[in-house]
Amino acid sequence: MSPTEPRASQGSPTGTSPLRPKPPQPPQESPWFFWRSVLLTLAVALGIRQFLIEARYIPSGSMLPGLQIQDRLLVEKLSFRGRMPKRGEIVVFRAPHHFDPTLVAQHRTGPLGCLLVNLPFIGSLQGLQNPACDAYIKRVVALPGERISVNPAGAVRINGTPLNEPYVRNFCPVDSQGAGPCRSLDAVVPPDHVVVLGDNRANSWDSRFWPGGPFLPKNEIIGRAFWRFYPFQSIGRLGPASPPVR
């Protein structure tokens, strides 16, 4: 063999480079793995929203001045599983169309219907709105066994004692005879019910106006609004609670 003749590579009789094995390819993920992760995330998020805590926003001025339109709040759902609401607490509850006998007859809906309506972006679609699927936010003013009196201006007495409500700034207008556009109220609260009013007494559709009666059943309460997280300059705990009636 000539010294200048190229030698074949060792182990290759043809003189070509040996074939190297391809590196192992990572196994391809099944599309089901991705969708399973998405579904699991959604299930956890919906479970937290359904049973623990959820965010709500203020759509109207019924709780002015303490709660402004478009305020964002956190509502926790654990407190009232073991106790009744306390006076002064701000509660979120299902619309009276869901429990008021007169209104229920006009706006019937099933639980699945409200579940769909309350999903993000779906409830805003034209034709899907249902008053029975709405939620309201008001303040608890009277508890089971108490006699509540509300005069035409919106001032409250509990068992004959005036209720100190520093959060109320806007009472209903009344004339020289004490009459006005707002309804008065005089009733004894039954067990497992409360009476709720908006802080803006002149512009709140609350217990005073429900056609089937002024009482909110405890089991219709969604939760307690306890924290405002928007706007950022107003972040903080909600209050104040009304002092006890003596």
Each model region followed by its residue ranges:
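Soluble "head" domains of membrane/secretory-pathway proteins
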Residues: 2-36, 47, 51-57, 62-246
